Amino acid sequence: MRAPIPEPKPGDLIEIFRPFYRHWAIYVGDGYVVHLAPPSEVAGAGAASVMSALTDKAIVKKELLYDVAGSDKYQVNNKHDDKYSPLPCSKIIQRAEELVGQEVLYKLTSENCEHFVNELRYGVARSDQVRDVIIAASAAGMGLAAMSLIGVMFSRNKRQKQ
C-alpha cells in the first residue's frame, strides 16, 4: 500500500511533477501556495506554460495548490532541511505574501521557481534542476570530446600504418 501524501504545512516546499520538469511553490496555508508564473499565463494553463522558458519576467502569484498542480502529482519536498536551517515559518509566509502580485526577474538558469522558493524557505537561492542539467550537459560534452579524441587517434594510427 502506498503511503499517503503528507498534508502540507505553512512554509513547506511543494514540488509539482510537470511532464518535462519540476515546478516549485511554497505552501502558505488554507490550501494556497505562492509561486512564480509567466506574466502572460492564462487561467488554468498552470506553470507548465512553455512561455515560462521564453520570458525574462514572472509574476508572483498566490493560488490554490489544487489549481496550480492541476492533474500533475505533487509532494512536500523540504529537501534542503538537512543542509540549511529553514527560516521561521512566520517569516517565510510574510516574505511570500509581500511578494504576491510583483513582477520579478525570471531566468531559467539562475532565477527560476526553485530558486524562488528556496530563497523564501532558507534564505538561499538554489536550483538542483539547473545544477543537474548543467552536470549532465557537461558530462555529455566531455563524452563527445573523448569520442572525438579517440576517433582522431585511430584515424592517425590507421594513416601511419598505410
Swiss-Prot record:
<keyword id="KW-1003">Cell membrane</keyword>
<keyword id="KW-0378">Hydrolase</keyword>
<keyword id="KW-0808">Transferase</keyword>
<dbReference type="GO" id="GO:0005778">
    <property type="term" value="C:peroxisomal membrane"/>
</dbReference>
<keyword id="KW-0442">Lipid degradation</keyword>
<dbReference type="GO" id="GO:1903008">
    <property type="term" value="P:organelle disassembly"/>
</dbReference>
<dbReference type="GO" id="GO:0005764">
    <property type="term" value="C:lysosome"/>
</dbReference>
<dbReference type="InterPro" id="IPR007053">
    <property type="entry name" value="LRAT_dom"/>
</dbReference>
<dbReference type="GO" id="GO:1904177">
    <property type="term" value="P:regulation of adipose tissue development"/>
</dbReference>
<keyword id="KW-0256">Endoplasmic reticulum</keyword>
<dbReference type="InterPro" id="IPR051496">
    <property type="entry name" value="H-rev107_PLA/AT"/>
</dbReference>
<keyword id="KW-1133">Transmembrane helix</keyword>
<dbReference type="GO" id="GO:0006644">
    <property type="term" value="P:phospholipid metabolic process"/>
</dbReference>
<comment type="similarity">
    <text>Belongs to the H-rev107 family.</text>
</comment>
<dbReference type="GO" id="GO:0005635">
    <property type="term" value="C:nuclear envelope"/>
</dbReference>
<dbReference type="GO" id="GO:0005783">
    <property type="term" value="C:endoplasmic reticulum"/>
</dbReference>
<dbReference type="GO" id="GO:0046485">
    <property type="term" value="P:ether lipid metabolic process"/>
</dbReference>
<dbReference type="GO" id="GO:0004623">
    <property type="term" value="F:phospholipase A2 activity"/>
</dbReference>
<keyword id="KW-0812">Transmembrane</keyword>
<dbReference type="GO" id="GO:0031966">
    <property type="term" value="C:mitochondrial membrane"/>
</dbReference>
<dbReference type="GO" id="GO:0005829">
    <property type="term" value="C:cytosol"/>
</dbReference>
<comment type="subunit">
    <text>Interacts with PPP2R1A; this interaction might decrease PP2A activity.</text>
</comment>
<dbReference type="GO" id="GO:0005765">
    <property type="term" value="C:lysosomal membrane"/>
</dbReference>
<keyword id="KW-0443">Lipid metabolism</keyword>
<feature type="active site">
    <location>
        <position position="35"/>
    </location>
</feature>
<dbReference type="GO" id="GO:0030397">
    <property type="term" value="P:membrane disassembly"/>
</dbReference>
<comment type="function">
    <text>Exhibits both phospholipase A1/2 and acyltransferase activities. Shows phospholipase A1 (PLA1) and A2 (PLA2), catalyzing the calcium-independent release of fatty acids from the sn-1 or sn-2 position of glycerophospholipids. For most substrates, PLA1 activity is much higher than PLA2 activity. Shows O-acyltransferase activity, catalyzing the transfer of a fatty acyl group from glycerophospholipid to the hydroxyl group of lysophospholipid.</text>
</comment>
<dbReference type="GO" id="GO:0006641">
    <property type="term" value="P:triglyceride metabolic process"/>
</dbReference>
<feature type="active site">
    <location>
        <position position="23"/>
    </location>
</feature>
<feature type="active site" description="Acyl-thioester intermediate">
    <location>
        <position position="113"/>
    </location>
</feature>
<feature type="transmembrane region" description="Helical">
    <location>
        <begin position="134"/>
        <end position="154"/>
    </location>
</feature>
<dbReference type="GO" id="GO:0070306">
    <property type="term" value="P:lens fiber cell differentiation"/>
</dbReference>
<keyword id="KW-0576">Peroxisome</keyword>
<dbReference type="GO" id="GO:0008970">
    <property type="term" value="F:phospholipase A1 activity"/>
</dbReference>
<keyword id="KW-0458">Lysosome</keyword>
<keyword id="KW-0963">Cytoplasm</keyword>
<dbReference type="GO" id="GO:0007031">
    <property type="term" value="P:peroxisome organization"/>
</dbReference>
<dbReference type="GO" id="GO:0070292">
    <property type="term" value="P:N-acylphosphatidylethanolamine metabolic process"/>
</dbReference>
<feature type="domain" description="LRAT">
    <location>
        <begin position="13"/>
        <end position="129"/>
    </location>
</feature>
<keyword id="KW-0539">Nucleus</keyword>
<dbReference type="GO" id="GO:0005789">
    <property type="term" value="C:endoplasmic reticulum membrane"/>
</dbReference>
<dbReference type="GO" id="GO:0005777">
    <property type="term" value="C:peroxisome"/>
</dbReference>
